[in-house]
Amino acid sequence: MYFHIMQKIQIYDSPLGKLTFVSDGLALTGIWFDKQEPLQQILKAPHEVCNLPIFDETRLWFDTYFDGQQPGFIPRLSLIGTAFRQQVWRNLQLIPYGETTSYGTLAKQIGQQLGKNKMSAQAIGGAVGNNPISIIVPCHRVVGTNGTMTGYAGGIWRKEFLLDLEVKHRR
């Protein structure tokens, strides 16, 4: 899925542990926590640890974010996935900083956008769970219908940390 060209990577030390930035050389194609399966696959394929302007932008974004400020920009992204997944990921980017939405609400929104009466929250959950750009594409802002902390590839404790950080610094 990500291996058509040699991947460029860089490691970022965050308050949540190491994040690996992945790029095609021009845009971000992934941001992964250690031990996530997609990262393990990337590391098995030919890759190069290097410095790129996109990594400089991404480090600045994360430095700003973890300093409790809402970054005023988004690094260039290359979201690789089906049209449906890309639509879900675009909708994730519309969830305001410091706020959450439920899988069901997201399913209704996307169903309306697609002209469908119903959309499965499970289908939405599958797309959310396959988000390749952790934190910048804020899948951590999606919670269970009753506000429960459900499913986060980086671990529920990281999801709680991110939401607490955003709520604390929301303007």
Predicted regions located by residue number:
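Histidine (H) residue identity feature
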Residues: H4, H47-C50, H140, H169
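A sequence-level detector of short linear motifs
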Residues: T20-F21, G30, S102, G151
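Nucleic acid-binding interface residues in structured DNA/RNA-binding domains
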Residues: K8-P15, L60, Q69-R171
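DNA-contacting interfaces and partner/effector-binding or oligomerization modules
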Residues: Y2-T29, E37
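Compositionally biased, low-complexity segments enriched in small residues
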Residues: M1-Y2, G155
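Compact structured core domains
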Residues: G25-I74
